[in-house]
Amino acid sequence: EMCIRDRFHLNQPWIRFIKTIYLNFKLLPWNIAVKLPIYLYGPVNLYWLKGKIEIKSNKIYRGMIKLGRNYEYFNGSDGSSFIYMSPKSTIIFNGPCAIGNNYKIRVETNAILEFGEYTFFGSSIKFICTDKIKIGHYTRCAYESQIIDTNSHFVYNEKNNKVARKKGSIEIGDFNWIGNRTTITKGTKTKEGTIVCANSTLNKDFTKLEENHQMLGGIPAKLITSGLKRIFSTKIDKQIEQYFSSNKDEEFYTIKTPFIDNYNDIIYWFKKIM
């Protein structure tokens, strides 16, 4: 279905029915494929498709996973989207997932790319998985970011005559908010509720740090501060927006009651807008 705001957006790509049907029946078990849980939108190239897709969700329904829609409304499809799956490669969806237009997904032999439930990725996102990439539930990653678990080439250290592994796993925690044009490389791990500043490069295990609700940023990224939480509740967000609209000189809004976020609003967003 096309939501109301889509009617006013000329660059919203159409669902590609033939490729949608082909991908579902090519990569999913027949009893799952008939439900057409994956929708492909806009121009997309399908390469090889020798792996498999698993959907680990109690409820599997039509279009719960949407790839290639235009969610951000500042660019159109450029025809560069592709899905490449080598033999014995696996993509796992643990629930609903949305990926914007102009995406690239490449999963190599024996590699596993896993998406948590209700995850969202902006346009021009790039996934290159040669080992294992796991992205936590409710995580959001903005446009033009890339998650790559390999250096692609070995590097010789002439100081100690050693050569490190060129690939390694990536594990992104639940409820992460990753800014645009972020690069996430092998060995990266983040805690639940992490915020990543735009244009950052993550390349290490941040779960070893004691601080929770971390804000990371920089090249390479480091801990900037902690104790910051993105607000997901639509109701609270509107209250704050109204406050600042009515109080032009105020810099901060004070939450006077214990802060309890409503993560169900993420589910609502998926159902009403996705």
Describe the role of every protein-language-model region.
Residues 5-148, 169-175, 182, 192, ...:
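Domain-scale signature associated with acetyltransferase and cell-envelope carbohydrate enzymes
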Residues 147, 152-158:
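Short helix-loop boundary/capping segments
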Residues 153, 200-201, 207-208:
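Flexible glycine-rich beta->alpha loop in the catalytic core of nucleotide-sugar glycosyltransferases
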Residues 162-170:
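A short acidic, glycine-rich active-site loop
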Residues 179-180, 198:
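Conserved beta-strand->loop/alpha-helix structural units within folded catalytic cores of enzymes
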Residues 185, 195-197, 201:
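A generic "structured core" feature
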Residues 188:
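Short beta-to-alpha loop/turn elements within the nucleotide-binding domains of ABC transporters
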